[in-house]
Amino acid sequence: MTSADSDSEPQQPGWLQALGIYRHPQVAAMLFLGFSAGLPFALVAGTLAAWLTRSGLSMTSVGMFAWVGLLYAFKFAWAPLVDQVRIPVLTRALGRRRSWMLCAQIGVAGALFAMATLGPTENLLIFAGLAVFVAFSSATQDIAVDAWRIEAVSLDMQGAMAASYQLGYRIALLISGGGALAIGDEMSYSFAYQLMALLMGIGMITVLLVKEPDVPAQKGTQQLSILNDPAHWINEAVVQPFVEFFTRNASQAVVILLFIGIYRISDMVLGVMANPFYLDTGFSGLQIFGYVKTVGLFAVLSGAALGGVAVARYGLGGPLVFGAVILAVTNLSFAGLAIVGPNIPFLVLTICADNLAQGFTGTVFIAYLSGLTNVSYTATQYALFTSLMVLPGKFLSGFSGAIVDALGWISFFLYASLMGVPAIVLAWLVSKHMQLQANRQD
């Protein structure tokens, strides 16, 4: 090999250089946008369920409120509007992505204030409608934030952006979950929700400070009105994102979609049964809260940061395969805990392994999905990918309890781990395809 050939080969960045990616201003801004995206989630889920329970509602009524969260899984349905529709005044002042982020954040904050003012005992139907509006606005914010994240930086920085997003998101979940619960019990849930609404201001300030990505709307739809020519608009904004994806990826499109659907399926199937398993094993609620919220949070954030560095240093292929492997393998630690019983050190080991794997794969997979999108249809395509990622696991997790009842905990965890094997195979195939594409471009 000549020196010229050697010089022309791309060099992998060192670990210190890879870590330096977190100093980028857009990566720092992503931390606060991730916080804004994560804050409403618990407020229409676990924290809301606690408020309803404290207010004396029946378990049937409390359970029905869980359907509010389905809006997150179907956000692809209105993602084309976020991609293409201009908001009067705001879009001209802030740009396409920032205007939708700010509008959604105002919607979340306003509805949270209204929920705090009304309360569930005054008019449950209106209260439920406000909860639905919070979820809708929150899901809309997710669409816009994801689009901004993908368009704001190059592909090699998507791992760091995903890690920063996860960090902000997890901190927000801790505040709107554990923090709001504590405030609600000690003071009132109305005050807790008012405080959470005020914290949405963090995201609003961030939106006003960051730059709008320099990516134009799809030609032909930027000025197109859905009212003037709805058929043309639907074709350009809804149909074309799907056509473009299948045209660009050709025979690999089906493999990619299948991979998206099953990559994290073993983790989702197990996750819904984690707390019941801890309790059934003999751990107290205080022990679970203490270790999951402290050790678990540290582990998942560490995994997220490592995932960002791995993508910056090695690209996406290797980390995708490694992530699929550790997701399947770490599930076996739960089987070990089921054998050992209520052993605190083994509990800590299990929580660390599981959350480290979740954080790592979360970052890597978000970066991968970001690279799949075409910037002309960022919001629509990414919303479709994330919905596809969630729906199969959510569906299969509904059968987890029946499997535990029929086979027991150890067999269930072995089953959950084996469900990760197809993901490993597909991750390897996708990695090889990415490598072939890179070689052709070289």
Give the location of each predicted region:
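Juxtamembrane intracellular "pre-TM" segments in multi-pass secondary transporters
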Residues: 7-23, 215-255
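Helix-loop boundary and gating motifs at the non-cytosolic
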Residues: 12-72, 253-259, 263-277, 281
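Glycine-rich segments within core transmembrane alpha-helices of 12-TM secondary carriers
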Residues: 72-75, 159-184, 388-397
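Helix-to-loop junctions at the C-terminal end of transmembrane segments
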Residues: 75-93, 302-319, 404-405
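C-terminal ends and interior cores of transmembrane alpha-helices
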Residues: 99-121, 325-342
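Symmetry-related core transmembrane helices of the 12-TM Major Facilitator Superfamily/SLC fold
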Residues: 103-109, 191-209, 413-429
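Intracellular juxtamembrane helix-capping segments at the cytosolic ends
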Residues: 139-153, 360-374
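C-terminal transmembrane helical hairpin of 12-TM major facilitator-type secondary transporters
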Residues: 317-365
